């Protein structure tokens, strides 16, 4: 008679889930026009959570009152406490803060956009922010745009559009309208989107930023076949 002792442990659970959450719907709808709602509900295909939301999630135009952002089950609720500006594109950039509840797979570069007017501004200003002294990337720095081209705007007015640099110093300011801008970097200690403390680290670019749409034509490859007549 043969016998063996049973091993105590968890049953095999199959392969590890490496699929990030998938966005499946929202209220208001993504890309909604003439939106007046300050509360946004986002729905995903699985249970999710937010990681370091206060560091990673950026609302543009910037909000003086910190938005309320909560994850529950398969939903994320965003409550914008500032009044909405008319005829303005709003972008809630989550970066990689949204992850699935079990394995922590991130939904990378996810952003939600709506407009309080009749159109969505779709241009982006992207780049990399480096420390001038050693050319190392700067993480977590606010990068913002001013359409007011006076130098005094930087320390008198809040940014109009913003983004935050990642661990490689990269940033992408979304929802930018056509026009001319000055761009600045700011380690915003008091979170008022304005340079008003001498201790705050700053960065700037000498040239104006003029985003524009470019038409690109893609040429497909054609194969030329020679057919001989009989």
Language-model segments: what does each one mean?
Residues 192:
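Acidic carboxylate motifs that coordinate Ca2+ or other divalent cations, activating on Asp/Glu
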Residues 205-214:
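Short, composition-biased linear "edge" segments at structural boundaries
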Residues 222-230:
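Residue-level detector of conserved catalytic or cofactor/ligand-binding positions
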Residues 5-168, 172-175, 180-186, 198-204:
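Acidic, low-complexity Ser/Thr/Gly/Pro-rich repeat segments typical of extracellular/periplasmic
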Residues 6, 216-223:
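Intrinsic N-terminal pre-sequences and regulatory tails
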């Amino acid at each position: 008679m043969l016998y063996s002792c049973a091993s105590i442990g968890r049953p095999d659970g199959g392969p590890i889930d490496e699929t990030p959450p998938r966005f499946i719907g929202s209220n208001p709808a993504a890309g909604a026009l003439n939106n007046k709602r300050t509360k946004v509900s986002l729905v995903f295909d699985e249970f999710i959570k937010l990681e370091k939301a206060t560091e990673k999630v950026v609302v543009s135009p910037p909000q003086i009152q910190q938005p309320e952002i909560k994850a529950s089950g398969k939903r994320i609720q965003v409550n914008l406490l500032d009044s909405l500006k008319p005829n303005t594109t709003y972008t809630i950039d989550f970066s990689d803060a949204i992850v699935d509840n079990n394995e922590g797979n991130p939904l990378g570069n996810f952003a939600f956009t709506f407009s309080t007017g009749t159109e969505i501004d779709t241009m982006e200003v992207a780049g990399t922010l480096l420390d001038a002294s050693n050319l190392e990337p700067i993480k977590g720095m606010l990068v913002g745009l001013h359409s007011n081209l006076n130098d005094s705007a930087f320390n008198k007015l809040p940014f109009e559009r913003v983004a935050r640099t990642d661990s490689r110093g990269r940033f992408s300011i979304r929802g930018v309208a056509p026009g001319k801008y000055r761009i600045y970097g700011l380690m915003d200690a008091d979170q008022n989107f304005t340079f008003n403390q001498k201790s705050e680290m700053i960065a700037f670019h000498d040239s104006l930023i003029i985003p524009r749409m470019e038409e690109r034509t893609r040429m497909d490859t054609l194969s030329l076949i020679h057919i001989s007549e009989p």
